């Protein structure tokens, strides 16, 4: 039996859903699942220190291969002692493959069997990223969990295109496995693609499961499809993945999507959503989204969320935070970012307890009755 550097341990399966309580063991520590992972694109979660992330309860964070390759460079990070040392983070790190960022550059990229040619978004120079190069960069970064290089087709692409795409992604996954220099201390995940086509998702999953990765990601979702379409894909995709390995849904961070993903057996999630909307003054609360810049909060001296015990809510009022953001003070963004990250990490803590108590469906109903499926200011 293969001795993987990444191991999944099931603690409890929820009686009424596909949800599972567990933990993932990595070379830099163990974290509980289901877990939301804050995104630190440039080797930092925007405006948050490592100490703050630990206080929030972030057991693992994500960094971006594409951006770190371009700046400051993966070889420089390797010379510094690796990404953990470079950014002073001694807990697990997951890196993506760079594929999603490359495919976001739709107007300036060319896909071939060898890899992808694209324009550097910083200076316009021509760049080439292959499965082997994506693995080499991540080996230099030294992340605990790495991603295979894949193509992320748009959800509504034609069937024939998606079929060719997933077959190429499977070939790229095999090439990446062969190029992986550090299988003893870095776990490489395969990424299941296939847009909304069940037979293609089945084909992609079968190809990757046969390669025996230590974990599996579900890609190609949260790219414009409806919530119902995402759930339908998860319904037929997650059961295709091994029960004894981690399952990671990429790019998902809306609270309702997190809970529905857990119900369908997903263990890990990431998204830039909490910090991105925080910078615009949008805060997640137990009563829905709150747009703190609105004038009605100018003399509101209550916390962002009456049910939240995070540092922001314990110490600062809506009026003060609104003032900071209106005055373009960075501290305001720090406070809203901290709160939103805490909200999602703490939500997953509550979800884990609901799995333990076998009442996740009731928890979902109660939560969404108050939160309101991401509708802004539902009860304000």
From Swiss-Prot:
GO terms for molecular function: metal ion binding; tRNA-guanosine(34) queuine transglycosylase activity. HAMAP family: Q_tRNA_Tgt (MF_00168). It catalyses: 7-aminomethyl-7-carbaguanine + guanosine(34) in tRNA = 7-aminomethyl-7-carbaguanosine(34) in tRNA + guanine. Pathway: tRNA modification; tRNA-queuosine biosynthesis. This is Queuine tRNA-ribosyltransferase. Residues 251-257, 275-279 are annotated as: RNA binding. Binds 1 zinc ion per subunit. GO terms for biological process: queuosine biosynthetic process; tRNA wobble guanine modification; tRNA-guanine transglycosylation. Zn(2+) binds at residues 308, 310, 313, 339. The keyword Nucleus does not apply. Its EC number is 2.4.2.29. It holds the Pfam family TGT. Homodimer. Within each dimer, one monomer is responsible for RNA recognition and catalysis, while the other monomer binds to the replacement base PreQ1. Keywords: Glycosyltransferase, Metal-binding, Queuosine biosynthesis, Transferase, tRNA processing, Zinc. The active site is at residues 96, 270. Belongs to the queuine tRNA-ribosyltransferase family. It is an enzyme of class 2 (transferase). It comes from Streptococcus pyogenes serotype M1.
């Amino acid at each position: 039996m293969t001795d993987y550097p990444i191991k999944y341990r099931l603690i409890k399966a929820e009686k009424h859903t596909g949800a599972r309580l567990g933990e993932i063991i990595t070379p830099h520590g163990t974290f509980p699942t289901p877990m939301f992972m804050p995104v630190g694109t440039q080797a930092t979660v925007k405006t948050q220190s490592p100490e703050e992330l630990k206080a929030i309860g972030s057991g693992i964070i994500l960094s971006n291969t594409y951006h770190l390759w371009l700046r400051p460079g993966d070889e420089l990070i390797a010379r510094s002692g690796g990404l953990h040392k470079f950014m002073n983070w001694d807990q697990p790190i997951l890196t993506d493959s760079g594929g999603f960022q490359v495919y976001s550059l739709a107007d300036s990229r060319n896909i071939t069997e060898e890899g992808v040619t694209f324009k550097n978004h910083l200076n316009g120079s021509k760049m080439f990223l292959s499965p082997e190069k994506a693995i080499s960069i991540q080996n230099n970064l030294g992340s605990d969990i790495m991603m295979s290089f894949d193509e992320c087709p748009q959800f509504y692409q034609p069937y024939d295109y998606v079929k060719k795409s997933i077959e190429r992604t499977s070939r790229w996954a095999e090439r990446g496995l062969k190029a992986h220099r550090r299988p003893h201390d870095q776990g490489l995940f395969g990424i299941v693609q296939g847009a909304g086509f069940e037979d293609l998702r089945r084909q992609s999953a079968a190809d990757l499961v046969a390669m025996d990765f230590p974990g599996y990601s579900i890609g190609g979702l949260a790219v414009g499809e409806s919530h119902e379409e995402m759930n339908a894909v998860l319904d037929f995709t997650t059961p295709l993945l091994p029960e004894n390995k981690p399952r990671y849904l990429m790019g998902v961070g809306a609270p309702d999507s997190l809970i529905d993903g857990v119900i369908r057996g997903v263990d890990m999630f990431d998204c830039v959503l909490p910090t991105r909307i925080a910078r615009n003054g949008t805060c997640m609360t137990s009563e829905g989204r709150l747009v703190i810049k609105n004038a009605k909060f100018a003399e509101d001296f209550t916390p962002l969320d009456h049910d939240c015990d995070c540092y922001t809510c314990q110490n600062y009022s809506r009026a003060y935070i609104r003032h900071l953001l209106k005055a373009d003070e960075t501290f305001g963004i720090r406070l809203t970012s901290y709160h939103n990250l805490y909200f999602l990490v703490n939500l997953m803590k509550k979800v884990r307890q609901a799995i333990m108590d076998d009442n996740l469906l009731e928890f979902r109903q109660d939560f969404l009755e108050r939160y309101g499926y991401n509708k802004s200011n539902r009860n304000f």
